[in-house]
Amino acid sequence: MSSSTSPARLLTCFALALALAASPVRPARAVTIDLVTVGNAGNANDTTGYGAVNYEYQIGKYEVTISQYAAFLNAVAKTDTYDLYNGAMASTGNIAGIVQGGSPGNITYSVLDNAGNSGNRPITYVNWWAVARFANWMANGQPTGPQNATTTENGAYAVNGNNDGDVPNKNSINPNTGLPPTFYMPTENEWYKAAYYSPTLNGGAGGYYTFATQSNDFPGNTSGSGVGNQANYNNGVYAVTGSADYVEAQNYLTDVGAFSASPSYYGTFDQSGNVYEWNDLTGTFIGNGGGVRGGNWFDIWFNLQSSRRSQPAAASDLGYAGFRLAAPVAVPEPSTYAMALAGLACCYSLFRRRRAR
């Protein structure tokens, strides 16, 4: 056998085909959500009664940003039928980031320069319904068009024109794709585990930290220092200004991931501080409320703890709350399987040709 037909060469060919199957190929989109995998399925609840999840899943590494939400608005809110934009996103200096322009039927949305580019800061002034619609849009492949069943009104959640009242369960199947939703709002247990759990605690038996910075000690609030256990909150001075004085027009949000040495065990950032984050509680019927956790930039350390939670009305546009999305563990798309099979067929053809010589 010649060197070109060596077992090593054939093994390389097969490895390439398998790599294609393991690496989903997705079309370019306006918004990319960086995800981390939360493993260690079957962990027990914390003493607070939260955190047990018996399956692997993924969750956003960062909070959804102002730029990402502006892209969403520009895709589906030329006519903003269901109030996805709140004017406070432009007028409230502490968190301002998106300004509305254009004309009725052709509304546009631009990221503000609010004491520096606002684009990588977390979006706020969103309610449960707006978060569900963003999740639907992501689950539907980020389509462009009016707010209807194929863009914002169905997908992960059948919101169907509602902006108040009882919230719907998460769909097991996205009716627009025939598959489980690829993005959704994390349940409270999913959010909690990603923030506070570590399988290395208690001698490898697993356990929970008090803060989402892998610490039981309350954090500092210095960004960009390379020092761990830091977060955007008020520890006597505000993290952004380093001053105890509150200024109404001052931005107080930090870029997502600014505290780069302070991830959770699974690699998420800012689940303590910056902004509170919406969660979907149990993910099943919960009346007209949603959950928020994590604390924010004006809170003291007490509200950043794992024991602190709130359950506001789902229709509340909270100026102190944003969100991150969750997703199932990635499964290769059909096109990826086709590529892998093509690679295997190529390997087989090469092997047959070489043997025939």
What would you call each of these model-derived segments?
Residues 2-14:
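Bacterial N-terminal signal peptides that target proteins for export
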Residues 11-23:
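Bacterial N-terminal signal peptides
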Residues 29-30, 258-264, 285-331:
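Disulfide-stabilized, aromatic/cysteine-rich ligand-recognition loop
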Residues 44-61, 222-236, 302-320, 351:
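Short, polar loop/linker segments at the starts of domains and inter-domain junctions
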Residues 51-52, 58-188, 194-222:
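Active-site microenvironments of metalloenzymes and redox enzymes
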Residues 117-119, 170-178, 224-227, 232-272:
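Short, well-ordered junction/capping motifs at the entry into regular secondary structure
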Residues 333-350:
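A short, hydrophobic C-terminal helix/tail in secreted or cell-surface proteins
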Residues 354-357:
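Short, charged juxtamembrane terminal tails flanking transmembrane helices
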